[in-house]
Regions:
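Catalytic domains of carbohydrate-active enzymes, especially glycoside hydrolases
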Residues: 1, 41, 173
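Alpha-helical scaffold elements lining the catalytic groove of polysaccharide deacetylases
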Residues: 20-21
Length: 179
């Protein structure tokens, strides 16, 4: 599964970066040798990502809490600038007191808890990140091997329906069950 040097949270990569896309393509090349194997039905993209072991995780909150200047952070801040236009409008919606949009580069804990608008913005961006997390490697794998199913990521569990974002890229949505 593709990784990036900078992480958003635990093993969650900077999924909106070019590095993630390139690593997805490079990792998918490993499938070429078995693309015509009639004994194989498919493959799992990964197994139980460690970032997903946190109940009700809002990934965009981790973007703003993480001190790294990631591509995800750049795109989140750009989306907020586009939506709100002024820091005053953002402050009103989010119930915050930022001096300017650059304040968003400083670690901010639990941004989605600041207001309903903040929660909506953060959950929307989290879904964009989750979609990229799943879609980019899925497409890279299908380009190399269109003959086998993508069997999902073998989630440990799903604590929030948003974690299923991007499921349409799988042929099978898989969850490990240890009951």
């Amino acid at each position: 599964f593709p990784e990036t040097k900078k992480k958003i949270f635990r093993d969650f990569p900077d999924v909106l970066s070019d590095e993630y896309k390139e690593n997805a393509k490079n990792n998918a090349k490993a499938l070429a040798a078995r693309k015509n194997d009639p004994m194989m039905i498919g493959y799992f993209l990964r197994n139980e990502p460690s970032w997903a072991f946190v109940d009700n995780l809002v990934l965009a909150d981790e973007v703003l809490y993480n001190p790294e200047r990631t591509v995800c952070k750049e795109k989140l801040i750009a989306a907020l600038k586009e939506k709100y236009q002024t820091v005053e409008a953002l402050n009103t919606a989010w119930n915050t007191k930022f001096n300017d949009f650059d304040d968003l580069y400083q670690p901010i804990r639990d941004a989605s808890a600041k207001s309903d608008a903040a929660k909506e913005d953060q959950k929307t961006f989290s879904k964009e990140m989750l979609r990229a997390y799943v879609e980019i490697p899925s497409k890279a794998c299908r380009e190399v091997d269109p003959n086998h199913m993508i069997l999902g990521m073998r989630w440990a569990w799903i604590s929030d329906p948003d974690l299923a974002t991007g499921w349409e890229n799988f042929d099978v949505f898989s969850i490990n069950c240890y009951a």
